[in-house]
């Protein structure tokens, strides 16, 4: 299973600006575990600009709503727990359990 990891900037998925990627291989089997966008300085700048633009809305979000959003994000991660474990095991050569 090969996982593709792109850049999530300003609410959308993107390739790296120059389309460069880096590949991680399973250390024991030499299979490709993941291919990730290799962010450039320009990509980093876009990330910083998007974060700065989003901050006022986050700053003004009430604590209870922030809590709800973060708990929702945690729930989405838990629903994909097996995929996270498989990806980390493949990239590091570790066992899943």
What label would you give each PLM region?
Residues 29-97:
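Glycine-rich loop-to-alpha-helix module at the N-terminal edge of alpha/beta enzyme cores
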Residues 1-36, 68-72:
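Terminal low-complexity tails and localization/encapsulation signals of metabolic enzymes
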